[in-house]
A protein has these predicted regions:
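Conserved PLP-enzyme active-site core in the AAT-like
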Residues: 1-83, 101-105, 113, 136, ...
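A general structural signal for well-ordered secondary-structure junctions
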Residues: 26, 60, 110, 152-153, ...
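N-terminal, charge-rich interaction modules
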Residues: 91-102
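Generic C-terminal helix-cap and adjacent flexible tail
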Residues: 186-194
Length: 194
């Protein structure tokens, strides 16, 4: 910038790997494990001399982690896939999750609907709201049971204390959504080992 202070953008789960750099950011940091769907890792894009500063931290005191060849190869492959595979649109996400939402809405004490990404990205998710009095369970306990089943199922649980969870359907097939529905249905019916 005009004062010689580098602009660093923590883009975390953003989907566009170029827009912030092209808009003038000096360094842009992305999570390798979120939208890119790679291993636990990160990706830094930016001006050469600032990236060199980041690389020096490899030998620094208190570095966060030692990167192994498996992580590098995993992230490299994930980025390659991310840049070459067709992206699913929000409308396609809605189409995929509509039967899932309809099935969930047939369950007593469950209300499901499509919600759009709060940051304005073209991402639709399934929001599932549980009436805890009707289902006679805490949402947090249900989320834990879903994680601990034969098929581990994880949700966005930022609002679990309000009885709300979200399903991100980008990497999930229609068949997998049906499996998730049957697990929720079984747990609501009191089957502990569903």
């Amino acid at each position: 910038g005009q004062h010689g202070v580098p602009l660093i953008v923590d883009a975390a789960a953003e989907e566009d790997l170029q827009c912030y750099y092209q808009a003038g950011a000096d360094l842009v940091i992305y999570s390798g494990a979120k939208a890119i769907e790679g291993p636990t890792s990160g990706l830094v894009i930016g001006r050469h001399h600032y990236v060199e500063w980041v690389k020096r931290q490899t030998n620094g005191i208190g570095r966060a982690m030692k990167v192994g060849k498996e992580g590098i190869l995993g992230l490299t492959q994930a980025i390659e896939n991310y840049l070459t595979q067709p992206k699913i649109s929000g409308a396609q996400m809605v189409e995929k999750m509509t039967p899932f939402i309809e099935q969930l809405n047939s369950l007593n004490g469950v209300t499901a609907r499509v919600v759009w990404d709060a940051a304005g990205r073209d991402i639709a998710r399934a929001e599932i709201k549980f009436d805890e009095a009707a289902i006679q369970q805490r949402t947090g306990d249900l989320v834990q049971a879903l994680k601990n089943g034969d098929v581990a199922i994880y949700f966005r649980g930022y609002k679990a204390n309000e009885g709300i969870i979200e399903a991100d359907v980008r990497s999930v097939s229609a068949d997998q959504l049906h499996t998730i529905f049957t697990r929720i249905q079984a747990l609501l019916n009191g089957e502990k080992n569903a």
